[in-house]
Each structure stands twice: as structure tokens, then as C-alpha cells.
A protein has these predicted regions:
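Short loop/turn segments at strand-loop or loop-helix junctions that form parts
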Residues: 61-66, 103-106, 300-303, 346-348
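A general structural signal for short secondary-structure junctions and capping/turn motifs
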Residues: 50-53, 91-93, 230-231, 332-335
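Glycine-rich, charged/polar anion/phosphate-binding loops
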Residues: 45-47, 224-227, 254, 283-285
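N-terminal basic/disordered segments at the start of proteins
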Residues: 1-57
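Short glycine/proline-rich, acidic loop/turn segments that cap or connect secondary-structure elements
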Residues: 349-367
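Active-site-facing alpha/beta catalytic cores
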Residues: 57, 67-68, 72-274, 317, ...
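Non-transmembrane, aqueous-exposed alpha-helical and coiled segments at domain scale
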Residues: 251-254, 266-298, 304-353
Length: 395
């Protein structure tokens, strides 16, 4: 390994400008020597469960933070998040009759792609944007916003602590209830971190040991770029976010690069098009894919395409927009003889007020009072239950 960047910036978008490449080299060497965070068998088990969801025999519920904070990697907070996920999944199963695959946006969701590389404060100061705790800190100072490679080691440690807590929870409940595994997924954004944690699997291949399920974001899904090539190189189940700008040709290329008909749960397409775009754009993609559409798991992300700015200048989302996208997603798939495989939500385990119930409420100039997110707005526990219950009723 050299002190130069491992990846060409033009081929790997949304990568930090690290403060020291020499320190980055040392950090990556340290990560390469560490044990895997998850084992390959669990990743293979998740692939099989996603395959069942793709066939309509189960449903994936993925919920959790937009951007995890290191400070939340303590047993009390992790258990609260896991309990919320499992309650939502139980409610979904009770209503729909479908088994639920339970996956958190957890134990690795420490990095976020951003629309702009900088942020201008009210006094005119220009700072690097907050990119997640694995890169920098949200406090509005230059020191906090500096991208420090040492934070990758903190990401590994906090992810490990979180996964240990989840495993202890699952094992502790196994003797008292039907065992329900908590899988962990995150966006595989920081490619040097992800690559440093690639390990051999039992079949002679390689898997990303940073999490059970890894997805590529809508901003980094270019088929000829490094994020997609990384996803193609590992045996984990992987997802790709598909937004309204994704052409049918691009989606087809991604399916052929990342899909595997021998393993139907290998590829999930996570659709995030917004309530206005979901039916026409998804219909266009499905028509172009034809029979290939049946070889992937179709998951709805009804959050990211419906982010707005409210009258107080805060980013927010409306539950009625979220539900409209879910309804359009389900109807478009059914029109093509396909089954919805899952739902990805950004949720808080505390009673925050970051999303509103109706779009009309977004016009209010009064700031939402309990706004705690480090990045995007999350559903409160009440709102999450409402969305899950209404989705279950659709199915």
C-alpha cells in the first residue's frame, strides 16, 4: 500500500478529502489486520432471506438512522433501536401474515453523501460539510469538520460494539421466543474503509465484513465507477438506490453486473423516486427490464425522494408523501406481476418532531421543536408505526 489514494477521485465520487494521506495509509493497514465485523455465513443467510422476499414469501423491513452517531453505540441506545425495529416487524407480520426480515440501518451508517462539499454559516464562514461521524463531526468549526482518518478506526470500534450488543440480544431471546436475527446494513460509501474490511468467504470468494447488507447510493451508482465495481467484487447481498434520474438502460446494466439468478436475493433495487415520479419512472424501468425485473428484490425507500424544506428552513418530510410513494411503488410492481420485497425507513427511537403528518404542515414558519437529526429528518416512533401498519394493510 502506498501513501497515495487507493482510488482515483474521478472514479469514486463522494470520497472525503482526508487531512493526511500518510495517516490514512496507517489506518487502512490497521483495519486490514482486524477481525471481520460480521461473518460470511450470516451474509449468505440474509441472501437466502432476501430471495424469499423477492418471491413474495417474506418482507424486508429496514429501519434506523439517517446518520448514526458514535455516541449512540452504547448498549442502552442500541437495544432501544433494536426493540423498535422488532416491534415494527412484529406489527407488520401480524397485519400482513408475512414473515419479516429484520434489518437495521445500524452498525455502520456512519458516512453520508452530500449535495455540496461545503456549508456557509450565517456569518459567512465556509466550512467543509458534515459527512458522518466516520469522517468528521457536525459542530460548525473547522477543527470539527476536518476529515480525520483516525475516525475510521472509531467507526470500526463502534460498529463492533453495536453488533456485539445486537448479537447478545438475539441470543438472549432465542430461548424464550422464536429466534429473529437482527441484520445490519449500511451504505458502502467510504470505499477505502470497505475495501480494508474485505475478507475471504467459505466458497473461495470475498465478502465485505463491515456489514451483512451493503448498498450503493443514488449518487454513486454509475456502472463504470468504483462503488459498483466494489459491490460486484463481494459476495454479500447488495442494494442499489434507484432515483428518478436513473435511466432504464443504467438500471439494466446494474442488474446484469450485480444480479445473480442462481441467488435471487443477491441484488436489491431500492427505489427512491418521490411521490410524483414513482409510478411513471418505475413503470418505465420495469418495462425496459422485462423478465430481468423478476430476478431482483424490489425495496421501497419512500423517504429520500420526499425531502422538503419547511417554512422554518428545516429539512422535513410528510407522512402522506411517504405513503403516496409506497402506494405507487406497490401498484407499479403489481401491474407488472411483481411483488414488493421490502421497505427502508429512516426512523428515530425517541419521540422527535422532524417529519410532519401532512404536506400542508410544511408551510408553517414555526420550527419543529424536537429536531435532533444530524442529517436528514426521521419518522417518530408513532409515525413509523403508522407507515408500517398502512404498508402491511396494502399487502
Amino acid at each position: 500500500m502506498t501513501a497515495t489514494r487507493l482510488l482515483l477521485p474521478a472514479r469514486a465520487l463522494q470520497q472525503p478529502e482526508w487531512a493526511s494521506l500518510d495517516e490514512l495509509k496507517d489506518v487502512l493497514l490497521s483495519l486490514e489486520a482486524k477481525p471481520p465485523l460480521v461473518d460470511a455465513t450470516a451474509c449468505a443467510d440474509l441472501t437466502a432471506e432476501l430471495g424469499r422476499a423477492a418471491r413474495g414469501e417474506a418482507f424486508v423491513l429496514q429501519a434506523g438512522e439517517c446518520a448514526e452517531r458514535f455516541a449512540d453505540a452504547n448498549p442502552e441506545t442500541v437495544l432501544a433501536k433494536a426493540d423498535q425495529l422488532h416491534r415494527l416487524a412484529d406489527e407488520f407480520t401480524d397485519t400482513s401474515g408475512l414473515p419479516t426480515v429484520r434489518m437495521g440501518r445500524i452498525a455502520g451508517q456512519y458516512a453520508k453523501p452530500r449535495s455540496n462539499p461545503t456549508e456557509t454559516l450565517s456569518d459567512g464562514t465556509v466550512l467543509p460539510v458534515y459527512r458522518g461521524d466516520a469522517v468528521n463531526a457536525p459542530e460548525p468549526t473547522l477543527a470539527a469538520r476536518t476529515a480525520l482518518p483516525s475516525r475510521l478506526l472509531l467507526a470500526y470500534r463502534n460498529a463492533g460494539n453495536t453488533l456485539s450488543t445486537l448479537l447478545e440480544r438475539d441470543l438472549g431471546l432465542a430461548g424464550r421466543t422464536a429466534p429473529q436475527r437482527t441484520y445490519a446494513g449500511h451504505e458502502a460509501l467510504l470505499l477505502e474503509y470497505e475495501q480494508a474490511l474485505v475478507r475471504p468467504d467459505a466458497d473461495g470468494g470475498r465478502y465485505g465484513s463491515s456489514g451483512h447488507f451493503l448498498w450503493i447510493g443514488d449518487r454513486t451508482r454509475q456502472p463504470d465507477h468504483q462503488h459498483v465495481q466494489f459491490a460486484a467484487s463481494v459476495s454479500n447481498p447488495v442494494g442499489v438506490k434507484i432515483g428518478p434520474r436513473a435511466s432504464a438502460e443504467e438500471v439494466g446494466t446494474l442488474v446484469r453486473m450485480l444480479g445473480d439468478r442462481r441467488r435471487p436475493g443477491r441484488l436489491s433495487l431500492i427505489v427512491r423516486m418521490g411521490r410524483e415520479n414513482i409510478v411513471p419512472h418505475l413503470t418505465s424501468v420495469l418495462r425496459a427490464l422485462g423478465d430481468e425485473a423478476a430476478g431482483v428484490a424490489w425495496i421501497c425507500d419512500p423517504m429520500h425522494g420526499n425531502t422538503r424544506t419547511n417554512g422554518a428552513g428545516q429539512k422535513s418530510r410528510a407522512v402522506d408523501d411517504v405513503m403516496a410513494e409506497i402506494e405507487g411503488f406497490v401498484s407499479a410492481l403489481r401491474a407488472h406481476g411483481l411483488r414488493p420485497a421490502g421497505l427502508m425507513l429512516e426512523t428515530a427511537h425517541r419521540p422527535v418532531t422532524e417529519c410532519v403528518d401532512t404536506a400542508a404542515e410544511l408551510a408553517s414558519p414555526t420550527p419543529l421543536p424536537h429536531y435532533e437529526s444530524a442529517c436528514d429528518p426521521r419518522l417518530s416512533p408513532r409515525q413509523a408505526r403508522q407507515v408500517v401498519a398502512r404498508t402491511a394493510a396494502l399487502l
